[in-house]
Amino acid sequence: MNKNKLERVQQKKRILVAPLNWGLGHSTRCIPIINALIAHGFEPIIASDGLALELLKKEFPDLKAIELPSYNITYSKKANSFKLKLIKDSPHLLKTIKKEKRAIESIIEDENIFGIISDNRFGVRHKSVPSVFITHQLRVLSGSTTWLSSKLHQKIISKFYECWVPDHIGTNNLSGDLGHIEGSTSFIKYLGPLTRFKKLNLEPKYDVFALLSGPEPQRTFLEIKLLKELENYNGKVLFVKGQIENEQKIEVKNHITIYNFMTSKELEIALNESKMILSRSGYTTIMDLAKLEKKAFFIPTPGQFEQEYLAKKLHKENVIPCCKQDDFKIEMLETLKDFSGFKNEEYQVNYGKLFS
């Protein structure tokens, strides 16, 4: 056997893991999958762009990381303009998907890729390599055009080998109508919620943990509003901006401790040490808080139908209170006593079977 063939035999099977760079949720929910791949003898290669890529590089400094073409997804300043902005940006998105496909062809050849795991990146797939798509949105809400956006999304998903949904399959689920549809679902696998965190028995250190995330400019708008409101809060506050930068920065303003970002381990400890969480209603955040059985107050990203739906669903189920971004007042946190908070349903992802 020649040297090149011997190297290929001895080499661990390489799996490309590529989350979408839209907020930090797609990248953070890939962390337990990457850890599981390593534990099962695979060699993950990370591929993304922007903050999502930077976050995973900090979490896995020893893994190879590849930059993919950027979708450059941002929110409009006005919530009611979000759908129009997506329509306007669609030619750029389609061009980016084509660039992604070309990039994937090169990566597969150069890196000897055995499998692909794409978290909501449409162009990260290849007909010669088993490619799976991770999403909690089998149904994509878009107001009056939900039927169209859902059909288009399902058509894209059907081009993948499998679709992994990070939720429970039964009625006691987190994603509701988003992650559960009628009809042929033979290629859909329900993993159970994905989270990088564990529940720890720690004494409370913070009364409120304000955890920010999501695309600009809405992330900044929420940061400004919450910092102003929390000035008048009578309690100890931890505030994480969700800005991934080269160096961690910590600032203390009276009763508020402000971080630009935290590592996964720091977040795990901080969440466990906090009495209540103030955040967006992103699905990854919901999975994390369900695992930790936390109480939370949600402020959905303006104009994002998915987050608005999830917040209203959980409010209706008496799990959490929520409100619109412009309406939030610090006094609203007092309503948490009237809600149950999250309860965890024990489960374990069978990664061995999943990766087989």
Locations of regions flagged by a protein language model:
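Conserved nucleotide-sugar phosphate-binding/catalytic loop shared by glycosyltransferases and other
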Residues: 11-14, 21, 39-40, 44-91, ...
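Catalytic binding pocket for nucleotide-activated donors in carbohydrate/polymer assembly enzymes
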Residues: 285-286, 290-332
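Short amphipathic alpha-helix
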Residues: 27-37, 52
